[in-house]
Amino acid sequence: MNHPVMNVSGAERGRCCASIHHSLDICGRSDCFWNCPSFEPQFPIPQRDLEKAFFLETSGARNVNFRQACAIESLALMNPHLTVILLMSGKDIDLESTTMKTLRKYDNIKIYVIKLGDYFIHTPLEQWYFCSTWNYGPYAVSHLSDALRFLTLYKYGGYYFDLDIIMIQPVTHYRNFIGAENENNLAAGAFHVDYLHPVIRMAVEEFRDTYRYVR
């Protein structure tokens, strides 16, 4: 069965010269012809001493649905001193939809669009993003979401929550935790790490080194 290929933003990055001193691209292929372009951060980088939490919308949707908006709103309401950040991968975000307009009313909710190619540059997952086959097959969005949640906390520290988790109490007294799926497995739907915590670097590197494409 043929599956659609998820577009890799900034795909030219995978073919540019990794160094001015040789003609290999970042994927190790020869005969590259141009230097890798520079890039600029796409949104204000959160202060590293700021309490923050991240949600990710990686399907390319223009907005979040009502259930997802409730999850974001509940976290902001229960934790007024927490900066709640929604990162979206879509290219045409509808900030005038009912859900997005509601979220934008909160001072502690920030909504940013990320350009995926730039987000992975100069990180341990750069080659994974540009050189592996993660974007083929039926699980591309899921694989991208897994990579982004680990990479985001690797870059900034803080909390990560899936968009189907509703908060009924404050969370900021929980630190450096991850939920359990069962007695043998951990779940990556809710976790926290302090900035530069060694565990998150280990998680990112293990994801990179053990990733296997699943048809």
Task: Indicate residue ranges for each PLM-predicted region.
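Juxtamembrane luminal stem/stalk of type II transmembrane Golgi/ER carbohydrate-processing enzymes
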Residues: 1-55
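Extracellular/periplasmic catalytic domains that process cell-envelope and extracellular macromolecules
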Residues: 45-49, 104-105, 170-171, 182-185
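Short, charged/polar "capping" segments at the starts of alpha-helices
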Residues: 63, 91-98
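Histidine-anchored nucleotide/phosphate-binding helix
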Residues: 63-81
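Short internal beta-strands
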Residues: 83-90
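Active-site-proximal specificity loops/subdomain of glycosyltransferases
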Residues: 95-96, 100-147
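GT-A fold catalytic core of metal-dependent nucleotide-sugar glycosyltransferases
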Residues: 138-186, 190-198
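Catalytic core and acceptor-binding pocket of nucleotide-sugar-dependent glycosyltransferases
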Residues: 199-215
